[in-house]
Amino acid sequence: MAQKINPLGFRLGVTQNDRSHWFAQQRNYSKDLREDQKIRTCIENYVRTHIKSSSNYGGIARVEIRRKIDLIQVKIYIGFPNLLLIEGRGQGIEKLRNDVLNMLDSADRKLHIAIEKVAKPYRKPNILAEYIALQLEKRVPFRKTMKKAIELAEREEVEGIQIQIAGRLDGKEIARVEWDRGGRVPLQTIRARIDYCYYPVQTIYGVLGIKIWILEE
């Protein structure tokens, strides 16, 4: 039988890089790892709560974290950074920084947050998954949503994209899995620059699971 594996971990060190860059002593490793997860969750929740737009949730592609002795450097790769500055939200980054600092266990460390714009947002599966989730929450038919998402990705000149949605689609009583693909997506080729994300979305019919694979070459 085939063995399923996370496409990012499968290619780590070949075409994918780590998103946390630091070293820690053995007794502190698990603590720092949990702290990284808390930082990412805090950032994602802040963006979804404060800068949700009509077409996306702000578009976070990924969050990279670097640590020094008393400094934590966070770089947020975001598809639509202007949403942090419009509608009187000029202090959005500073408020986000304060929220993260309040969440951290130690108050004597410094935190630096940098924002970097993603040139082609819909080449990133996380941003595309947020778009799909928003459409499903609005009860847009899932097939129409998948085709539109593939069109958005193809406009960004991706080599291939595969989308899978699982759950009670269109409110049907029996859960099922549906997928669509555009271009080629060689999942078993380690050298293929495939980006991937899994994104759950809560609907009135239950939780739907969205999986997206994008070949960036």
Curated annotation (Swiss-Prot):
Domain of life: Eukaryota
A GO term, aspect molecular function: structural constituent of ribosome
Keyword annotations from UniProtKB, A to Z: Chloroplast, Plastid, Ribonucleoprotein, Ribosomal protein, RNA-binding, rRNA-binding
Cross-referenced CDD domains: KH-II_30S_S3 (cd02412)
Record carries keyword Nucleotide-binding: no
GO cellular component, one term: cytosolic small ribosomal subunit
Domain annotation KH type-2: ranges: 47-119
BP terms from Gene Ontology: translation
Record localization: Plastid, Chloroplast
Presence of the UniProt keyword Plastid in the record: yes
Self-association state and partner proteins as the record states: Part of the 30S ribosomal subunit.
UniProt cross-references to PANTHER family, sorted A to Z: 30S/40S RIBOSOMAL PROTEIN S3, SMALL RIBOSOMAL SUBUNIT PROTEIN US3C
Record family assignment: Belongs to the universal ribosomal protein uS3 family.
Protein name in the entry: Small ribosomal subunit protein uS3c
Naturally occurring in which organism (per UniProt): Pinus koraiensis
